[in-house]
Regions:
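A compositional/biophysical signature of low hydrophobicity enriched in polar/charged and small residues
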Residues: 1-110
């Protein structure tokens, strides 16, 4: 791991600590295997929602984790090892303003 990457990991770990983490994961997959990959990803309990989409990514997943380290372990040890997954990009949720059609109050925002 490069020094820059280690610094980034440290900042993220300190920011999120042991708090639960929600994220959006963009997956690039082998086009011919998109349905098979989607079925495998959908079986992972951490994945809350999964969509086949157009654009730069092929699949978009919403996922939840106990903490940042659990997210990191999931990406490295499980998701990236699924046959047909070419690349992933993880977007960590900082604040949730609206979820499942409901606007969150100030106290509910995460």
């Amino acid at each position: 791991m490069t020094e820059e990457k280690a610094d980034y990991e440290g900042v993220i770990s300190r920011y999120y600590g042991d708090e639960s983490v929600k994220c959006i994961i963009q997956l690039k997959v082998e086009t011919k295997d998109a349905d098979v990959v989607a079925e495998k990803v959908a079986q992972l309990p951490e994945i809350e929602d999964l969509f086949l989409v157009t654009g730069d990514a092929d699949l978009i997943a919403k996922a939840g984790f106990e903490n940042y380290n659990a997210l990191k372990k999931f990406i490295v040890e499980r998701l990236s090892k699924i046959d047909g997954v070419r690349d992933t990009k993880t977007l960590m949720v900082v604040t949730t303003f609206k979820e499942r059609g409901k606007v969150r109050s100030e106290e509910q925002k995460t």
